């Protein structure tokens, strides 16, 4: 029994189109520009500005069989090289240091999440979330 060429080509197309690796394209872990906010107790305004953060997809594997003796961990997109910058919050009360220092991503990598430097929660607040009145820096 021979398979017509058109059926063979259709079969090849369908096999490739449903490949997990090719069914969608996700951006790889890399620095991206993002609007973020900083605020501090004693300062009535939240400062909103753009900076480079790490964002993107990291390949991960999850075992089919999960044993209580096996370690399961996932890699996340996080900072490799950073530079620190400082901004000054407006209208802070006397005695409150108005300066806030934040990391700027220079390069990123897929690695285990470090709670000391990263937000490792499943879903966190948006990066530009503010509890107080927002003030924008327009000259990024």
Swiss-Prot record:
Keywords: Disulfide bond, Glycoprotein, Hormone, Secreted, Signal. InterPro entries: Cystine-knot_cytokine, Glyco_hormone_CN, Gonadotropin_bsu, Gonadotropin_bsu_CS. Its main location: secreted. Residues 1-23 form the signal peptide. Pfam families: Cys_knot. Glycans are attached at residue 33. This is Gonadotropin subunit beta-2. The gene is cgbb.
């Amino acid at each position: 029994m021979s398979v017509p060429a058109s059926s063979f080509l259709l079969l090849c197309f369908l096999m490739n189109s449903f490949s997990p690796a090719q069914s969608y394209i996700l951006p790889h872990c890399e620095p991206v520009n993002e609007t973020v906010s900083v605020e501090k107790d004693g300062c009535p305004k939240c400062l909103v500005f753009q900076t480079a953060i790490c964002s993107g997809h990291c390949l991960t594997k999850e075992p089919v069989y999960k044993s209580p003796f096996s370690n399961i961990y996932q890699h996340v997109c996080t900072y490799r090289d950073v530079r620190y910058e400082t901004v000054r919050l407006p209208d802070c009360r006397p005695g409150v240091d108005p300066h806030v220092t934040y990391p700027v991503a220079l390069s990123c990598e897929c690695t285990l999440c470090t709670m000391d430097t990263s937000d490792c929660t499943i879903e966190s607040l948006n990066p530009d979330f503010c509890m107080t009145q927002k003030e924008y820096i327009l000259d990024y």
